[in-house]
């Protein structure tokens, strides 16, 4: 085996372990592989072996690109238990080098290798997270390659899902929700495969961290605007949480484009799943996020934000965090959506007919933007809102009166819409002859609503506990015994109750 190994590798080093531990660059892939494998034999460092391996990888990252022909032999001999970070770095070197040379065969092989190791669960997810500047750009680039170059989005989706799942298990753990550049590509692949349910668990409405995808040595060189952008995003990405409830991790390093990709593509997935409230939350953040210049995602998000707002609220409000000048710019760039944004639902004004007319006149623009189905849904929803407004006015009503007051075309249309409202559990209905007896139902809270409420309660309990701890540890008037003894004079010692002693 040693002979075979030496034939595959060149420039072997007999002092690989010593070189690695001293921080020296290792001159060959064989030396690097030996240095990493020897980490597992050093029992005293078993707990931080992943960090040591990550340090070796960063010190020798250029070696993987220079020796890309030796990558497969390296993968065969490197132990994934200690060398997961090195193995993905090797695959990234092979992928990047092949892509730069337009070597499609080499690029395909790199994707095949990554798919194999991820699919077999060979990598240690905890070790992969230690090299975010390697694993996440690799997943992102592989996903885009499968999506755009090979027209195989299902492969890119499977690879990213498996890799992210190993690093951030979705098993109810209390691990922080982390945003990476790979998430947006994952959602883009799912929009092509139409496998929305599989990626739904990866769409977090409460993001705790942004992955630092800049190399640690390059952090000082990163653009301050990118870090400011990340801080603003984290400050807003807390759906259902009390204002300022969570501390934000400072100085995240991720290009704003990938954050916008996450927001926009994630919102598109949620729209397909009919989770309109959550989609609106992501779209509102995307529209309101600052950027160096107006990105395509900003304008596309504004268009969908207008339509989803009308579906949910019957009107379009200016986003709380939005830049009013940017909103005006969006309206100027999309006059059709400007007309939609001026709609205000009113039963007596026959709003659904006005919306239907706008949809017909803007059908070409809607089709180009991919919003035709949302617009059709909007027209139906406006008709349902008209019927819902009647339930608040009358507890019983004739079908013919519903048809007249809701400006609907036929009795069949009335009964069809009422049937849909019953199926959606928005009203209960009892029909007796031509009379309809109905009641509006309160919406059933979704799983996300319940989780958000629990998160708020947990946060309030934490604040209460911290407050009590501060009071007990404080001095003077901060102590509870003094606070309840204010009338006894500042010079008097606090009185302690003996009632229950």
From Swiss-Prot:
GO biological process, alphabetically ordered: cell cycle switching; establishment of mitotic spindle localization; mitotic cytokinesis; oogenesis; regulation of oogenesis; ubiquitin-dependent protein catabolic process
PROSITE patterns with a match to the protein in the record: PCI
Residue span, PCI domain: 275-445
Keyword set, alphabetical order: Cytoplasm, Developmental protein, Differentiation, Nucleus, Oogenesis, Signalosome
Localization terms from the record: Cytoplasm; Nucleus
Gene Ontology CC: COP9 signalosome; cytoplasm; nucleus
Superkingdom, natural source: Eukaryota
Main localization (coarse): cytoplasm
Matches recorded under Pfam families: COP9_hel_rpt (PF22788), PCI (PF01399)
InterPro entries, per database record: COP9_N, CSN3, PCI_dom
PANTHER family: 26S PROTEASOME NON-ATPASE REGULATORY SUBUNIT 3/COP9 SIGNALOSOME COMPLEX SUBUNIT 3, COP9 SIGNALOSOME COMPLEX SUBUNIT 3
Function: Component of the COP9 signalosome complex (CSN), a complex involved in various cellular and developmental processes. The CSN complex is an essential regulator of the ubiquitin (Ubl) conjugation pathway by mediating the deneddylation of the cullin subunits of the SCF-type E3 ligase complexes, leading to decrease the Ubl ligase activity of SCF. The CSN complex plays an essential role in embryogenesis and oogenesis and is required to regulate microtubule stability in the early embryo. Mediates mei-3/katanin targeting for degradation at the meiosis to mitosis transition via deneddylation of cul-3.
Similarity remark: Belongs to the CSN3 family.
Assembly and binders: Component of the CSN complex, probably composed of csn-1, csn-2, csn-3, csn-4, csn-5, csn-6 and csn-7. Within the complex it probably interacts directly with csn-2 and csn-4. May interact with itself.
Protein's name in the database: COP9 signalosome complex subunit 3
